[in-house]
């Protein structure tokens, strides 16, 4: 190991231990002009902790300090290897293999382990105790009910309304932008007033507006990201979301229009934000499940940028035109018979 590698690894371990070690809730909180905890600003959740716990870890909610540091150093070494110049005469990668090298993957490469309440978490999910999503195996075929309905009835290209949310680059997942890190961007901006909280994710780039101390409409309809209302419980903002459009059912967290999501936002020590959510849907899950994610403030001067994705928008006109051509050919063939 070179001096640079040793130095970088040691620095990463120290920074990781410091940044993620203190997420206990505190009483001396920054407040807005209205007297509520101030969540405003730019946040990031750069860590390698997976949403679901590896099955071999069972009910182990946390790594030991030694295990966590070993994982951080391993990720640091991979990050350094990824940054090295590539051999122009190298063989092509094995079919289906993702190497995380610059020529085939530009996702973020986080190295930290998420830490909450002094624990290096093995997964974001903390309940059930095994850290896994409790899918109802009997109903797995219904987890993408919208997609399968279109496929089974040959409606996939009837019109733009029949397109999958991710296909049109509208919502590539998750249902709510802070629920788990989605490859390209773990960055979020929060803007807050007395009556509203706005959460803007960089990827996908959508503004979610939450009404505070309000109610869901008596007769509502499904919307992108659902309908969200919040209320204060001491220093915690509790947000309830319902009526999420069925086009937003993506793995690993599937949803229906009846899915309920309850989020809890609280400020922790050292300027951290503790984000917790619980997903409930008896149609899909054997029980509710809960995840916790620590966010830290982005460095001064860092902001988020619009992520523009057009593959499923401009190109979709061609997809529909091709489908209409196939329809016409089918009619010609039927007339010929």
Task: Enumerate the language-model features and the residues they cover.
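Bacterial N-terminal signal peptides that target proteins for export
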Residues: 1-8
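Short, linear, compositionally biased motifs with a strong N-terminal bias
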Residues: 10-14
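N-terminal signal peptide c-region/cleavage motif recognized by signal peptidases
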Residues: 16-18
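PEST-like low-complexity, intrinsically disordered acidic/proline/serine-rich tracts
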Residues: 22-337
């Amino acid at each position: 190991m070179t001096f640079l590698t040793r130095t970088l690894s040691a620095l990463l371990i120290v920074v990781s231990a410091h940044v993620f070690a203190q997420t206990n809730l505190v009483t001396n909180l920054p407040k807005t002009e209205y007297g509520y905890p101030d969540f405003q600003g730019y946040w990031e959740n750069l860590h390698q902790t997976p949403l679901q716990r590896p099955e071999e870890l069972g009910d182990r909610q946390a790594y030991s300090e030694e295990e966590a540091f070993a994982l951080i150093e391993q990720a640091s070494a991979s990050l350094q290897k990824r940054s090295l110049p590539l051999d122009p005469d190298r063989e092509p990668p094995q079919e289906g293999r993702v190497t995380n090298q610059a020529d085939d993957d530009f996702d973020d490469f986080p190295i930290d382990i998420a830490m909450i309440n002094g624990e290096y978490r093995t997964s974001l999910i903390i309940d059930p105790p095994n850290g896994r999503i409790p899918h109802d195996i009997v109903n797995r075929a219904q987890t993408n009910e919208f997609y399968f309905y279109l496929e089974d009835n040959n409606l996939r290209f009837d019109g733009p309304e029949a397109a999958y949310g991710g296909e049109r680059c509208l919502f590539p997942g998750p249902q709510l932008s802070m629920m788990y890190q989605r490859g390209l961007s773990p960055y979020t901006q929060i803007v807050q007033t007395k009556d509203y909280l706005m959460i803007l994710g960089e990827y996908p780039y959508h503004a979610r507006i939450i009404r505070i101390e309000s109610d869901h409409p008596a007769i509502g309809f499904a919307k992108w990201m659902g309908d969200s209302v919040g209320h204060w419980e001491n220093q915690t903002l509790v947000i309830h979301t319902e009526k999420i459009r069925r086009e937003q059912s993506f793995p690993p967290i599937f949803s229906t229009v009846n899915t309920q999501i309850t989020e809890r936002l609280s400020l922790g020590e050292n300027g951290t934000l503790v984000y917790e959510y619980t997903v409930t849907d008896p149609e899909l899950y054997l029980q509710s499940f809960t995840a916790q994610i620590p966010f830290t403030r982005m460095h001064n001067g860092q902001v988020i940028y619009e992520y523009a994705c057009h593959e499923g928008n401009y190109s979709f006109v061609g997809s529909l035109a091709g489908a209409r051509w196939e329809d016409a050919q089918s009619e010609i063939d039927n007339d010929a018979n």
